[in-house]
């Protein structure tokens, strides 16, 4: 990236669009040809690496500042609404990926999907308004009435971006997408820090969420090249809407796997413990975010484009899986050994209650990079019904196990422990098996790819824990460096001896040979 330019200066210049509406309605948004997928994926991954690094610096820096001005109790109040908002926006995810996957996509269909998305956004904002008093009663926090109404604006703005974002992903224009996301994060981070320093409490968290969606929606419309018009045949998108609703329904059911723990903690233990829970949950997700954000959008689009060529799809998936597991799994495992130091650096001394929760979450953090890749396969296959059945079973299991753990042990830590064991056990195994079945891939090559990586994770974590116990008298930051250094050396030594082939980013979007 040109160091003399800001991210928004790197966005592609827009060309003048035709005003011939008749021709415009007949135009299509074509997915890349098979022989272009590798080149576009590699180019997108290179840009994503640079901009992902920048976004993570912004995210961590913002978190470090805001967490020192906003208390765990106030973060917990914001989190009570954010969990509900996450539930509302799940339908938008279905509308996004159905556009990415559609083999033939005319502008009229996109317009129909956009119109439906706008209507949905209005209804979701209304739902946020109605839910405010209910959330306030459920959690015992009167502030949630107003907070829910304001956060509804972010939900509405997000619904406007589903089609512009989907069209960019469909065409593998990840450079533009990543720059848009980076600029939106930069501006929203400035808003959050300014509000936190001004001692606005939980409004700093809410303000960042709304500002992020506002900036992102404007930029996506500008740089996607999509200009919506009212559809003349709204029924033209009925097949896509049905598929999108199927994906959304699956997401809604899956929601309980991801957020039930937080809902229970907030309901029974209050805002302060929920704040610690959310911080630990966020750190648990970081290794997966670092490892997968670079390629997730690229891989869904690429695998969808290669869906008729099973051999190339399998080779591309294994290469991406190997890379993501190689980076994300050991990083997740090491969270067990370095939890006290990580929480201290990121959030400050007031967040010590998050440490034991993060230690438990390290178990889930090892599995998450792997299970995240299975989502690509489900999306690429288009087998919504299979994914829906799986999520119904797993969500039912989550409800039974988490409520059971709460009733038996009665602590927030027991809820986190149950969550982690579910993530690393039933969730992972069932997702891997069924996602491979959905696209017709064999499971055994995936298992062979993962076994040496998992063993290496255990070795590096054990060595780091040993260092921590032997040299516990050291200054905390020196001890952190010692743990990371020893754990890293052990893992890389193990990898060089047993992991073949070694993951290479430059091979990610290759032609499928030598997976």
What does each model-found stretch correspond to?
Residues 42, 97-107, 157-181, 198, ...:
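Membrane-interface junctions at transmembrane-helix termini in multi-pass inner-membrane proteins
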Residues 44-59, 205-212, 216, 220, ...:
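Transmembrane helical elements of multi-pass membrane transporters/channels
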Residues 2-27, 36-94, 116, 120-134, ...:
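Signature of the first transmembrane helix
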Residues 1-35, 432, 436-446, 450, ...:
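Membrane-proximal transmembrane or re-entrant/amphipathic helices at the cytosolic face
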Residues 65-80, 137, 143-145, 172-175, ...:
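Membrane-interface helix-loop junctions in multi-pass transport and translocation proteins
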Residues 11-37, 41, 175, 218-259, ...:
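Interhelical loop/hinge segments that connect adjacent transmembrane helices in multipass membrane
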Residues 89-107, 169-170, 280, 284-328, ...:
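Helix-loop junctions and terminal segments of transmembrane helices
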Residues 2-18, 22-27, 115-140, 146, ...:
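Alpha-helical transmembrane segments of multi-pass membrane transport and lipid-handling proteins
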């Amino acid at each position: 990236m040109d160091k003399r330019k800001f991210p928004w200066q790197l966005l592609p210049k827009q060309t003048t669009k035709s005003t011939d509406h008749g021709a415009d309605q007949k135009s299509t948004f074509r997915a890349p040809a098979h022989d272009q997928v590798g080149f576009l994926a590699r180019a997108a991954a290179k840009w994503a690496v640079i901009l992902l690094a920048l976004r993570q610096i912004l995210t961590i820096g913002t978190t470090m500042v805001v967490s020192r001005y906003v208390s765990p109790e106030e973060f917990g109040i914001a989190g009570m609404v954010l969990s509900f908002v996450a539930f509302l926006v799940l339908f938008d995810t279905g509308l996004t990926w159905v556009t990415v996957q559609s083999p033939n996509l005319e502008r009229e269909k996109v317009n129909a999907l956009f119109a439906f998305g706008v209507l949905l956004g209005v209804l979701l904002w209304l739902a946020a308004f109605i839910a405010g008093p209910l959330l306030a009663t459920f959690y015992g926090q009167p502030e949630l009435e107003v907070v829910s109404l304001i956060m509804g604006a972010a939900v509405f703005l997000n619904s406007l971006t589903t089609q512009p974002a989907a069209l960019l992903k469909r065409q593998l224009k990840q450079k533009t997408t990543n720059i848009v996301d980076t600029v939106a994060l930069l501006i929203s981070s400035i808003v959050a820090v300014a509000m936190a320093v001004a001692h606005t409490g939980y409004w700093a968290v809410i303000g960042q969420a709304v500002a992020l969606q506002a900036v992102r929606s404007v930029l996506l419309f500008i740089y996607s090249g999509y200009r919506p018009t009212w559809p003349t045949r709204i029924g033209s998108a009925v097949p896509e809407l049905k598929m999108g609703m199927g994906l959304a329904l699956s997401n809604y059911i899956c929601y309980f796997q991801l957020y039930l723990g937080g809902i229970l903690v907030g309901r029974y233990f209050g805002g302060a413990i929920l704040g610690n829970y959310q911080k630990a949950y966020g750190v648990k997700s970081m290794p997966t975010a670092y490892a997968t954000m670079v390629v997730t959008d690229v891989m869904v689009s690429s695998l969808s484009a290669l869906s008729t060529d099973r051999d190339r799809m399998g080779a591309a998936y294994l290469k991406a899986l190997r890379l993501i597991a190689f980076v994300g799994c050991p990083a997740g495992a090491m969270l067990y050994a370095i939890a006290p130091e990580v929480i201290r650096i990121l959030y400050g001394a007031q967040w010590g209650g998050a440490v034991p929760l993060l230690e438990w979450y390290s178990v889930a953090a090892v599995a998450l990079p792997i299970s995240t890749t299975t989502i690509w396969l489900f999306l690429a296959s288009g087998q919504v019904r299979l994914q829906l059945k799986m999520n119904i079973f797993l969500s039912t299991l989550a409800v039974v196990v988490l409520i059971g753990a709460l009733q038996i042990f009665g602590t927030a830590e027991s809820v986190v422990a149950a969550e982690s064991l579910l993530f690393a056990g039933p969730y992972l195994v069932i997702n891997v098996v069924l996602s491979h079945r959905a696209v017709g891939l064999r499971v055994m090559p995936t298992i062979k790819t993962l076994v040496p990586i998992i063993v290496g994770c255990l070795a590096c974590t054990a060595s780091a824990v040993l260092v921590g116990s032997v040299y516990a008298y050291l200054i905390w930051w020196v001890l952190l460096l010692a743990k990371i250094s020893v754990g890293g050396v052990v893992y890389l030594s193990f990898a060089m001896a047993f992991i073949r082939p070694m993951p290479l980013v430059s091979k990610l979007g290759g032609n499928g040979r030598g997976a």
